């Protein structure tokens, strides 16, 4: 392991900060929502091959409403929250970031909340529930939901979307 003292300091520092949940403040959520709304969804649609591509835009916003997702079991795999709560596994994960094993090497002072979330999700033997990509959902709405158009005689449709998130 990279200098054990360094790992202990980083471990203790992150424990003091708390679990690296996504932000929940209104300004952050509004900024991310605006990025999602302004994303060029047509770039995801391949009509010839009938494929809707993927983009991570808006996933962080969706996860910000579901902090409980970090502790939901997927089969027999560990949850990211179990890694966070286990001193040995959390220290091993931090070591992988500090040493550049599996993750991009970073000095302790440059480890971000995003790095921590990534490590907790990808730690060996761990799985996190997945979420439907908001951009893919929006692209499907663009294709299948009528728009208000006096010219075409259509009225804006209503969407009932049971895939709108993990929920509680």
What are these regions (language model features)?
Residues 124-131, 137, 153:
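Long amphipathic N-terminal alpha/beta scaffold segment
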């Amino acid at each position: 392991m990279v200098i054990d003292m360094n790992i202990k300091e980083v471990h203790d520092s992150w424990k003091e900060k708390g679990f690296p949940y996504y932000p929940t403040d209104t300004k952050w959520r509004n900024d991310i929502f605006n990025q999602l709304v302004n994303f060029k969804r047509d770039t995801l649609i391949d009509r010839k091959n009938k494929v809707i591509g993927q983009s991570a835009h808006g996933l962080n916003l969706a996860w910000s409403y579901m902090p409980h997702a970090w502790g939901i079991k997927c089969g027999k795999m560990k949850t990211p929250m179990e890694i966070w709560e286990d001193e040995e596994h959390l220290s091993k994960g931090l070591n992988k970031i500090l040493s550049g094993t599996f993750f991009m090497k970073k000095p302790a002072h440059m480890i971000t909340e995003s790095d921590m979330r990534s490590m907790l999700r990808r730690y060996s033997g761990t799985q996190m529930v997945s979420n439907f990509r908001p951009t893919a959902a929006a692209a499907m709405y663009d294709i299948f939901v009528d728009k208000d158009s006096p010219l075409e005689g259509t009225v804006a449709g209503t969407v009932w979307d049971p895939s709108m998130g993990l929920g509680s």
